[in-house]
């Protein structure tokens, strides 16, 4: 109580109210009792070695090392991947080391998980690497880059922009054919959309994402196929000269930037009907053959047979 006779009120958060009589209240400060806490030692005890930490991704039955993102469970080695996915042995030297990388193992692990969960994935397992089966890395002459496979069942078969025989060509492929006929008016018009005849002559028709969930374009971008494809293109650029790159649209142009002193790099808008620039005026097919002629090499027969 102060000299005026009024009760003393303490505003401290630790004050406790105590009633000492019926007539007067006095508030007394109760100082907090500080309890010394014992700090836990950092790290494991001396001489104790712990296993690497692991975690589980949602809905996944496999564990990963948190530092390297490497699957702890055993994975397919590169030879088994070549067998399961029907990859041409001609590509072994270029692909085998890359398929051993942790990110590549993660791609196949997630692919298998999706497949086992019942997801319908396009194209079929045996066609994902179909682009390797028509010519080896040393026979590649032209590179055409797409985005991801057609999401309609029966269309995709492992070659960018191409569809199986008997399937009506999609709009983008129709626009490619329109440009082809504009450049070669005497050519027999294509009667189907299968571009295997191009692939056999060394035209690499490569999507940056190799799989897709049926009916959902872009659904497998997250798997990491793009990194694998970029490494394939990088190694081709490093090991070869005189290739022709047809980069249609911003996506393809961002995927790879070949050295124009070593290769012919051609750019144009994407053949999609949504592009602002009509694809009909694209002269890449003629320009590629003119380039080969100057080098004394045979032209590509762009007929779709």
Swiss-Prot record:
It is found in: Host nucleus. The active site is at 148 (proton acceptor). It catalyses: Hydrolyzes single-stranded DNA or mismatched double-stranded DNA and polynucleotides, releasing free uracil. CDD domains: UDG-F1-like (cd10027). InterPro entries: UDG_fam1, Ura-DNA_Glyclase_AS, Uracil-DNA_glycosylase-like, Uracil-DNA_glycosylase-like_sf. One of its GO terms (molecular function) is uracil DNA N-glycosylase activity. It is an enzyme of class 3 (hydrolase). GO terms for biological process: base-excision repair, AP site formation via deaminated base removal. Keywords: DNA damage, DNA repair, Host nucleus, Hydrolase. Its EC number is 3.2.2.27. Pfam families: UDG. It comes from the Viruses. This is Uracil-DNA glycosylase. The lineage of its organism: Viruses, Duplodnaviria, Heunggongvirae, Peploviricota, Herviviricetes.
């Amino acid at each position: 109580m102060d000299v005026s006779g009024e009760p003393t009120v303490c505003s401290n958060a630790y004050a406790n109210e105590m009633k000492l009589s019926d007539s007067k209240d006095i508030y007394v400060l109760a100082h907090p009792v500080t309890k010394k806490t014992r700090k836990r030692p950092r790290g494991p005890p001396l001489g104790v070695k712990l296993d690497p930490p692991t975690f589980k991704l949602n809905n996944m039955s496999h564990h990963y090392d948190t530092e390297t993102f490497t699957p702890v469970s055993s994975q397919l080695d590169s030879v088994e991947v070549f067998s399961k996915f029907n990859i041409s042995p001609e590509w072994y030297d270029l692909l085998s080391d890359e398929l051993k990388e942790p990110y590549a193992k993660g791609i196949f692990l997630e692919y298998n998980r999706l497949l086992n969960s019942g997801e319908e994935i396009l194209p079929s397992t045996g066609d994902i690497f179909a682009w390797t089966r028509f010519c080896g890395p040393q026979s590649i002459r032209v590179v055409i880059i797409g985005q991801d496979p057609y999401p309609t069942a029966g269309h995709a078969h492992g070659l960018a922009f191409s569809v199986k025989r008997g399937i009506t060509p999609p709009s983008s492929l129709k626009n490619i054919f329109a440009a082809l006929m504009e450049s070669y008016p005497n050519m027999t018009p294509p009667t189907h959309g299968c571009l295997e005849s191009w692939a056999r002559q060394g035209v690499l028709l490569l999507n940056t994402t190799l799989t897709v969930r049926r009916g959902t374009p872009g659904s497998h971008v997250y798997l990491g196929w793009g990194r694998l494809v970029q490494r394939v293109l990088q190694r081709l650029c490093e090991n070869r000269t005189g290739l022709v790159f047809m980069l249609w649209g911003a996506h393809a142009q961002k995927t790879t930037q070949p050295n124009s002193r070593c290769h012919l790099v051609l750019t144009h808008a994407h053949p999609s009907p949504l592009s602002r620039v009509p694809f009909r005026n694209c002269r890449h097919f003629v320009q590629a053959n003119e380039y080969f002629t100057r080098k004394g090499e045979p032209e590509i027969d762009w007929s779709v047979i």
